[in-house]
Amino acid sequence: MGRFVNSIHCTDDIAVVSPVLVSDKQEVQSLRNTSFPVYKHTFDIAQSGMMQRISSIHACGGYDRNLFIDSVDWEFVVRCMQHGYQTIRLNHCFLYHQIEDSNNHEINVNGHIYHTNRYEPLRYYYQYRNALYCRAKYQGSAYEFIWDEVLNGLDHAAEYETQSEEI
C-alpha cells in the first residue's frame, strides 16, 4: 500500500485506499493466480486496513456518530464518493482478517430462535439497525441499493444458519 500511496497514481481525489481482506494463505494464492487490475474503484471497502486521507475525512464531515461497528466504513466511503472522492481497493495487497466468532449463539427475533456461529447477537442487532438507518439516510439516492443488499445478505445468512442447525 505504501508504494501505491507514494506513487503518482495516488492523486488528491483519492480519499480511501484499502487492501483485499483474506482469511487464509490459500485465498491469497488463489487471488495471486488470478489476473486483476492493480486497483478497483469500489464502495465495498472495510475499515480494517483502510488508509484514509485526513483532508477527505474533514471535507466529508468525519464518521457518522449514529453508527456503531457495522456500516461505519461503507457509509463513510459513500459520503466520500458523494463529495467527488475516489475510494479504491488494491487488488494485490492483502490483509489477513478474521471477522467471525467461533462460538455458537442463539438469537431471538420476534419469537423465532436463530442459531449462529458467526457473531454475538448484539453484533447482528447493530448490523440490522445500521443498515436500516443508512437505507433511510440514503433513500432516493444512487447508494440506497447498498443497504438493501446488506439487509438481503443478513436475511439470507440468518436463513442459512437456521437451516444448518436443522440438518
Model-flagged regions — what are they?
Residues 45-67:
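Conserved nucleotide-sugar donor-binding catalytic segment
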Residues 56, 66-99:
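A short, conserved alpha-helix in the catalytic core of glycosyltransferases
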Residues 121-137:
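A conserved mid-domain beta-alpha-beta active-site/ligand-binding segment of alpha/beta enzyme cores
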Residues 35-52, 119:
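A recurrent flexible, glycine/aromatic-enriched loop bordering the glycosyltransferase active site
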Residues 14, 136-167:
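Non-catalytic, C-terminal membrane-associated alpha-helical segments of glycosyltransferases
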Residues 42, 110-125:
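A short acidic, glycine-rich active-site loop
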Residues 1-31:
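Conserved donor NDP-sugar-binding/catalytic core segment of glycosyltransferases
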